[in-house]
């Protein structure tokens, strides 16, 4: 996956110019696997110049036994199968959403998710992971005091439905320093512990200065608020 990401991200046309973003999208990785096959991908990677970022990860992939490589490709294809949905492919084909806008202009972004179907949870997880990162970068690079000009409030209702956020325990710990505030809303502590196991959920809860409990129906939540 890493090798193909680097390959697609840095792909160029015949004149050596990078392809448009719409042709360097995540859905193209699925196309490479289903339309080209592993043998053609081998040839394409071999033609890349020395030092290309795709060569290193692909070299590690080639160290696996041949039958294992096939299983890796099949597994990757299954995980990327969601990109057969044209709407998902189109949504990830460009970067029209300004992730830094909330930090310097009053606005509101709404992410409407299904609480029952987790098929597209990776998209919401990616969105929130990226917006935390971009706002942090904006505060560090574009402001004198390292703080966002406009405070950004994240109301994370049905938090587990968002999908697991990469290194969220770190994000929620540093956000206030950049004028970002998180309101984490869950139906039970057990939900949070299931999504962020091994005491990670406790670190997240510890970063919340205030806790409001509207009622509990499980022992784990009851013990936490008692």
Segments and roles (model prediction):
Residues 110, 182-184, 212-213:
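Structural recognition of the beta-strand scaffold that forms the well-ordered cores
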Residues 5-6, 100, 106-107, 169-173, ...:
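P-loop NTPase motor core of the ASCE superfamily
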